[in-house]
């Protein structure tokens, strides 16, 4: 009897934990928040900074936002382009432009100080050059492009 009670309690705890976890992806309609006017997709992912010796630090939660072009915005302007915005747990953020091919498949735009390399283990390494010559290097397990495409 005691083992059955313990099993039920463990099963209940697992069900409650699964019910409380956030979904990986959340869709938000235009005007659904007070800080972003257009529609967007948010991913709950993991990021880790990379030390100068190339070794990654500990994982920390990060938020990945897909920001689609604003309707009627010219494509040559920032508002007319696709972006991914990454917010780190320490409140830093970076934006990476996306490009769409003829089949409307999105990919990270590289060049102009942006280098992106899949690590082969579910993580992707991002190296972004700042305007002041500094570099931001981090890994993320983001799946946002797979989800969008």
State where each predicted segment sits.
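Sec-dependent signal peptide recognition
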Residues: 6-13
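N-terminal secretory signal peptides that target proteins for export/translocation
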Residues: 1-5
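Cysteine-centric segments in proteins
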Residues: 24-149
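C-terminal motif of bacterial Sec signal peptides marking the signal peptidase cleavage site
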Residues: 18-19
């Amino acid at each position: 009897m005691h083992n059955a009670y313990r099993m039920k309690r463990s099963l209940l705890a697992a069900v409650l934990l699964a019910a409380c976890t956030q979904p990986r992806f959340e869709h938000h309609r235009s005007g659904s928040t007070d800080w972003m006017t257009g529609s967007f997709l948010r991913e709950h992912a993991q990021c880790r900074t990379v030390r100068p010796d190339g070794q990654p630090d500990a994982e920390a939660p990060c938020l990945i936002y897909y920001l689609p072009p604003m309707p009627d915005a010219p494509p040559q302007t920032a508002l007319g382009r696709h972006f991914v915005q990454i917010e780190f747990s320490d409140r830093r953020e970076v934006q990476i432009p996306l490009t769409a091919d003829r089949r409307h498949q999105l990919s990270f735009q590289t060049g102009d100080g942006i280098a992106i390399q899949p690590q082969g283990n579910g993580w992707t390494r991002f190296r972004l050059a700042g305007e002041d010559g500094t570099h931001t290097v981090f890994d993320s397990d983001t799946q946002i492009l797979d989800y969008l495409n």
